[in-house]
């Protein structure tokens, strides 16, 4: 039975409206960053910038400690993602391949940790960091970001490991590989989509995190970009062009990562949910 014209059109119209609603704020942020100040404060909105200027980006990048915030964000984010992947590879393999007492309890524990609201634990984390004399340090940020990422990473990679036929691993071991060599040469290459999807999730989570760094790092030398952006009125006042330029610079790494990995990341998330 053929669907009516409305039945064929409305899903597309809805998708277009949602797309515009989601993309327009991002477009407006980048467009404002390139507009001259006169166009930004004009009573008549300038939808498409014609006079392109990079002055706002210069103002943002020349702000105090800007590059310190950038380097701090990159350090804690990359380290947290890499450490979580290394640990998750071992943990996901153990949960998917090995049978041991308490295995289901571990899986339930990781699920509960994934659902836990980390914001309510900020005060407890602050007390731990304070008692360890590690305030205003990047080390606790890296460790706790890794803990935030780890449950999702383990559960997702577990699905990928479980989907790899055991016969492939056994064939490699028959050919003379140890179990570690079989994992590295056979299983690890097949986990590439899962590694990409979990890497993207971990990068976005750590890159955008604010409550923890707001509490444990009070000195500018140990703060990250999200905290710097929250103080834009103090830094830039009413200079909305510089504010949008700073926000654009903050968003660019995530956009690049998403565009580069989005196909494999989406296929990785769906494939990792099939079996496990």
Curated annotation (Swiss-Prot):
A GO CC term assigned to this protein in UniProt: plasma membrane
Q: Which topology term describes how it sits in the membrane?
A: Multi-pass membrane protein
* Annotated transmembrane regions: 14-34, 74-94, 105-125, 137-157, 186-206, 241-261
Expression triggers: Induced by (GlcNAc)2 and (GlcNAc)3.
Q: Which SUPFAM superfamilies match?
A: MetI-like
Instruction: Give all residue intervals belonging to the ABC transmembrane type-1 domain.
Output: 70-261
Q: Which UniProt keywords apply?
A: Cell membrane, Membrane, Sugar transport, Transmembrane, Transmembrane helix, Transport
Q: What is this protein called?
A: Diacetylchitobiose uptake system permease protein DasC
């Amino acid at each position: 039975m053929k669907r009516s014209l409305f039945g064929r059109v409305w899903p597309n119209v809805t998708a277009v409206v949602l797309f515009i609603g989601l993309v327009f704020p991002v477009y407006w942020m980048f467009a404002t960053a390139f507009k001259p100040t006169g166009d930004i404060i004009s009573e008549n909105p300038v939808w498409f910038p014609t006079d392109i200027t990079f002055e706002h980006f210069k103002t943002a990048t020349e702000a105090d400690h800007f590059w310190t915030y950038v380097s701090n964000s990159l350090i804690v984010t990359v380290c947290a993602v890499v450490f979580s992947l290394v640990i998750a590879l071992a943990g996901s393999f153990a949960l998917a391949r090995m049978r041991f007492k308490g295995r289901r309890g571990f899986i339930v524990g990781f699920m509960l940790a994934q659902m836990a609201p980390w914001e309510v634990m900020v005060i407890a984390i602050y007390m731990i960091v304070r008692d360890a004399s590690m305030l205003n340090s990047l080390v606790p940020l890296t460790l706790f970001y890794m803990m935030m990422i780890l449950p999702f990473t383990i559960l997702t990679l577990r699905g990928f490991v479980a989907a790899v036929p055991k016969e492939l691993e056994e064939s490699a071991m028959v050919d003379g590989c140890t179990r570690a060599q079989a994992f590295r040469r056979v299983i690890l290459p097949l986990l590439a989509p899962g590694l990409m999807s979990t890497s993207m999730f971990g990068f976005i989570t750590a890159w955008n995190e604010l409550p923890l760094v707001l509490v444990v790092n009070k000195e500018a030398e140990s703060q990250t970009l999200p905290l710097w952006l929250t103080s834009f009125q103090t830094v830039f006042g009413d200079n909305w062009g510089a504010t949008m330029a700073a926000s654009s610079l903050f968003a660019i790494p995530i956009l690049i990562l998403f565009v580069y990995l989005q196909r494999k990341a989406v296929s990785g998330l769906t494939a990792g949910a099939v079996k496990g």
